[in-house]
Design a protein with these regions (language model features):
Chain A
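Iron-sulfur-associated redox domains of electron-transfer enzymes in respiratory
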Residues: 1-143
Length: 143, 115
């Protein structure tokens, strides 16, 4: 893995677009001392304007669609989007629900999917690494 | 006027050193600022205020709004106090004179009683 071009911390903004909080708890688990992704410089930030990565959990509810689009637009370029969980990836058990307009890739372009209900922190960390590589490529102008 | 070092028991004060420190801080601040993101696109959502994904309200919510509960809880006190704040200098001078009279009177009475 070559991550030389992206020579600083990876800042992540997390959006919950209707998740049951299962995935969100696993994301928190990735930040706790057992996994501690902050030692690699990966940290959650409080505003999309500071973020490199948009991390989305949950199938997109009707109320959240415009908000998600606006938040995506507020992330500076180059940016990458990661979906954590089955609901955000496919709709999961809520697939074709009357109240959904998702999954996430119907609203915004997605770079990495991490399936699972919820996915384990190891899977989330692997997804972040894949995303980091994609961001590297974007920064170099490969894609 | 010549700028010199003012020495006191506690330390010293030198305007030249102070200015030098100030300039150093400005240089460091400019350097850190130059390391920031340059990718923001002006005139797009990227430079808009983040308001949890909502459109920011046009009317500004002032910082005094956070004291709403405080003002509400002490409404009677503030209603009473606001009557005194007329904005007229004559009134304020009057309050001053009254307070000075009270202080002098208490000093005199207290002094007499003490004697």
């Amino acid at each position: 893995m070559d991550v030389k071009a992206f020579n600083r911390s990876l800042w992540v903004f997390h959006v919950n677009t209707g998740s049951c909080n299962g995935c969100d708890i696993e994301i928190i688990a990735a930040l706790t001392p057992r996994y501690d992704v902050e030692r690699f410089g990966i940290k959650l930030v409080g505003t999309p304007r500071h973020a490199d990565v948009l991390l989305v959990t949950g199938p997109v509810t009707r109320e959240m669609a415009k908000k998600l689009k606006r938040i995506y637009d507020q992330v500076p370029d180059p940016k990458a989007v990661m979906v954590v969980g089955n609901c955000g990836s496919t709709g999961g058990v809520f697939y074709e629900s009357y109240n959904l307009v998702g999954p996430v890739d119907k609203i915004i372009p997605v770079d990495v999917y991490v399936p699972g209900c919820p996915p384990r922190p190891e899977a989330i960390i692997q997804g972040v690494i894949k995303l980091w590589e994609k961001l590297e490529d974007k920064r170099r102008g490969k894609c | 006027m010549m700028m010199t070092t003012l020495s006191t028991i506690r330390g010293f004060w030198d305007p030249v050193l102070w200015m030098a420190a100030f300039i150093i801080v400005i240089v460091i601040t400019c350097y850190i600022r130059s390391l920031g993101k340059e990718e923001y696109k002006r005139g797009t959502e990227q430079t808009m205020v983040f308001f949890s994904g909502n459109i920011p309200p046009k009317e500004l919510i002032s910082s005094s709004n956070i004291y709403w509960g405080f003002f509400k809880a002490m409404e009677k006190y503030y209603t009473c106090i606001r009557r005194f704040h007329t904005g007229m200098v004559n009134d304020y001078v009057y309050y001053f004179i009254v307070i000075v009279i009270v202080i002098i009177a208490s000093l005199i009475i207290g002094g007499v009683l003490w004697m």
